[in-house]
């Protein structure tokens, strides 16, 4: 088997990761939406989807968990 077949799928989508990278820079939902050229609702959806994947109930918990897992850096 090829090495690529053994690589696990990333936990976050590319866009979810972009949102959280901006979130840890202390950007607001509005600022993130503006920077990524998406709506504030879409930003909230990306955050919510990531929170569901992580099994956490808040943005702060999601950030802490992503940092702990090495999925996000400060």
From Swiss-Prot:
DNA-binding annotation, residue ranges on this chain: 29-48
Annotated HTH luxR-type domain residues: 5-70
Pfam family for this entry, one: GerE
GO annotation terms (biological process): regulation of DNA-templated transcription
Gene3D superfamilies found in the cross-reference section: Winged helix-like DNA-binding domain superfamily/Winged helix DNA-binding domain
SMART domains with a match to the protein in the record: HTH_LUXR
Keywords on record: DNA-binding, Germination, Transcription, Transcription regulation
MF GO annotations: DNA binding
Function noted in UniProt: Involved in the regulation of spore formation. Directs the transcription of several genes that encode structural components of the protein coat that encases the mature spore (CotB, CotC, CotG, CotS, CotV, CotW, CotX, CotY and CotZ). Also controls the cgeAB and cgeCDE operons.
The name this protein goes by in its record: Spore germination protein GerE
Organism from which the protein derives: Bacillus subtilis (strain 168)
């Amino acid at each position: 088997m090829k090495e690529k077949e053994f690589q696990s799928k990333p936990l976050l989508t590319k866009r979810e990761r972009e949102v959280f990278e901006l979130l840890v820079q202390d950007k607001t939902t509005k600022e993130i939406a503006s920077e990524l050229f998406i709506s504030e609702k879409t930003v909230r959806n990306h955050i919510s989807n990531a929170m569901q994947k992580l099994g956490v109930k808040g943005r702060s918990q999601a950030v802490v968990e992503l940092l702990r897992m090495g999925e996000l850096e400060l």
